[in-house]
Amino acid sequence: MLDTEIPQTHLSSKLEVGIGISADPNPDAAIAEAAGLAGRRLGSATPDFALVVTAGSVARDAVGTLREVLGQISVAGGAATALLTDHGPSREGALVVCVANADGAASGVAATAGRNLCEAGQAAARLVLAGWPFRARYPRGLAFAFARPDGGDAAQTFLASWRDFMGPKMRTVCTVLGGAAAYGRGAAEPLASVVSVEAPYASGIGYTDATPTDGVTPTAETLVHGAADAMLTAVKRLEGRPPRLVVAIESAARLRMLGSALSEEWAAMRGALDEHTPCIGWVGEHVAAYGRGVQPTDAPGALIVVTLGDAPR
């Protein structure tokens, strides 16, 4: 069963982002609280879509709960291992990111099932593209995908099948959820949930991992330096435009390797940003991406930083 939503957009002159976080251990209650916060932070802007990520128990009705607060909004997301915020990691609660597109942008959301993740990735791309009849041959923009595990290389499998249809210009990050649920409307248990934005927004992806050097596993200090470099790379891609949103997505293996140094890693990444720039993230079983300077790999201890800013004037 497949589902996609292409909203009728109330466009604003610039990209607007509202973020809400709740530590309520009840995931549905946490989604409602976080959605309310995110909606209020958007002010008068009308959100086009929302990302919802939970930690701890899986939400019973993530989409329905969020829509009770924000109305008939398109939703993508999933249940992660932990949430990452300026207050430290959280093993329970919810994160909601609401986005109101700028003039000329279009967003599409799809939740897909299938016999395997390859089919789900192809179906998601077809559905999103079908809602963009005005699209260029290869749409340009940014996408966030959430996939349930389906084999040992789930992220690469999704990204390869998605890219076959979407083309090379849609920068895409895929979080593998470690057996937990992907959230979206349509399929009862979707294998994949994805939101994609076609727009000339400035965006950047920074990457680092924990691949051993000469057989030696990186130390926590090395991992912290790698994370700071990934953040600097992602910010540099914006070419001087201030980031509206910064997302750090960490693999569970990296979280284990860091141990108590996780707070140092977050501080190192945060140090590359203005204190008022919103920065959030989550932990998945694995994470991979393709985009400018980044290719999907199965390297251990991956960390991906994504930045999103206004389009050039």
Segments and roles (model prediction):
Residues 2-313:
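Hydrophobic alpha/beta core scaffold segments
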